[in-house]
Curated annotation (Swiss-Prot):
The keyword Ribosomal protein applies. It comes from the Bacteria. GO terms for molecular function: rRNA binding; structural constituent of ribosome; tRNA binding. PANTHER family: 54S RIBOSOMAL PROTEIN L1, MITOCHONDRIAL, LARGE RIBOSOMAL SUBUNIT PROTEIN UL1M. It holds the Pfam family Ribosomal_L1. Part of the 50S ribosomal subunit. GO terms for cellular component: large ribosomal subunit. This is Large ribosomal subunit protein uL1. Keywords: Repressor, Ribonucleoprotein, Ribosomal protein, RNA-binding, rRNA-binding, Translation regulation, tRNA-binding. GO terms for biological process: regulation of translation; translation.
């Protein structure tokens, strides 16, 4: 078991590990237990009763948080013609086609999000070994393969987050920064909660959400009642 430092242990004393906190309480406590010397990310972790091996239980999607994430993203777009112009006007950091493919092949990775038009995916596919392991391959489920590249860029710049269940049935997603008001964190939490609850597979039996916890970067987990997430 990993040893925790003094600052973590001091933060953990503020959390009662035997109780469930309300959303409002959890957001306030996540801020209070943030001890990093930077503006820590507040993250939520869902443990779901799903089997990701089943195609209909591979929960994945994206949403624009009402109050953003507090992080500015560098967005690159693979597009040509009118879509390339629209992406530039929407604020994309880099837009290109074969030239951008070559640039990435030569080591350019200074970006957080990749968006592509459907026609460009054959070219982007050549970058699979580079982008795939970093989770940067565009995907229609997250709105990053689209003809409406301008809207996709705007969503990313506005604070879109992606959520995806992993092999253990867990979803981790950021809902803001420790500098956010607790109320804004709660609004972001609610928005993510709603899409995850709506994504419940029809084939899932019994309790869908097994556990939910929020925490600041390096901070202790703060548990909420999985049966009462209001």
């Amino acid at each position: 078991m990993a040893k925790h430092g003094k600052r973590y242990l001091e933060a953990a004393k503020k959390v009662d590990s035997t109780k469930f906190y309300s959303v409002d309480e959890a957001m306030k406590l996540a801020k209070e237990t943030s001890y990093a010397n930077f503006d820590a990310t507040i993250e939520v972790a869902y443990n779901l009763n799903v089997d990701p091996k089943q195609a209909d239980q591979q929960i994945r999607g994206a949403l624009v948080l009402p109050n953003g994430t507090g992080k500015s993203k560098k967005v690159v777009v693979f597009a040509e013609g009118p879509q390339a112009d629209q992406a530039k006007e929407a604020g994309a950091d880099e837009v290109g086609s074969d030239d951008l493919v070559e640039k990435v092949q030569n080591g350019y990775l200074d970006f957080d999000v990749v968006i592509a038009t459907p026609m460009m995916m054959a070219k982007v596919g050549r970058l699979g070994r580079i982008l795939g392991p970093k989770g940067l391959m565009p995907n229609p489920k997250t709105g990053t393969v689209t003809m409406d590249v301008a809207k996709a860029v705007e969503n990313q710049k506005a604070g879109q987050v992606e959520y995806r269940v992993d092999k253990q049935g867990l979803i981790h997603a950021p809902i803001g920064k420790a500098s956010f008001d607790a109320e804004k964190l709660a609004q972001n939490f609610d928005a993510l909660r709603d899409v995850i609850l709506r994504a419940r597979p029809a084939s899932t039996k019994g309790q869908y959400v097994k556990s939910v916890a929020v925490s600041a970067t390096f901070g202790p987990g703060i548990h909420l009642d999985p049966l009462n997430l209001d």
